[in-house]
Swiss-Prot record:
Effect of Y20A: Loss of potency towards Nav1.3, and important decrease (10-fold) of potency towards Nav1.2 and Nav1.7
Protein's recorded name: Mu-theraphotoxin-Ssp1a
Organism annotation: Selenotypus sp.
Site description Pharmacophore key residue, residues in chain: W28, R30
Disulphide bond pairs: C2-C17, C9-C22, C16-C29
Miscellaneous comment as given in the Swiss-Prot or TrEMBL entry: Negative results: shows very weak inhibitory activity against hNav1.5/SCN5A (~60% block at 3 uM), hNav1.4/SCN4A and hNav1.8/SCN10A.
Phylogenetic lineage: Eukaryota, Metazoa, Ecdysozoa, Arthropoda, Chelicerata
Effect of N14D: Increase of Nav1.2/Nav1.7 selectivity over Nav1.3
Length: 33
């Protein structure tokens, strides 16, 4: 199971769905703009 849009995530263990990024400053799944 991957994490969807705006789910809290761990930048060191990114489990976001494909197409999303997890940044240390913004620790939630979001589009890579």
């Amino acid at each position: 199971d991957c994490l969807g849009w705006f789910s809290g995530c761990d930048p060191n263990n990114n489990k976001c769905c494909e197409g999303y990024v997890c940044h240390w400053k913004y620790p939630w799944c979001r589009y890579d703009l």
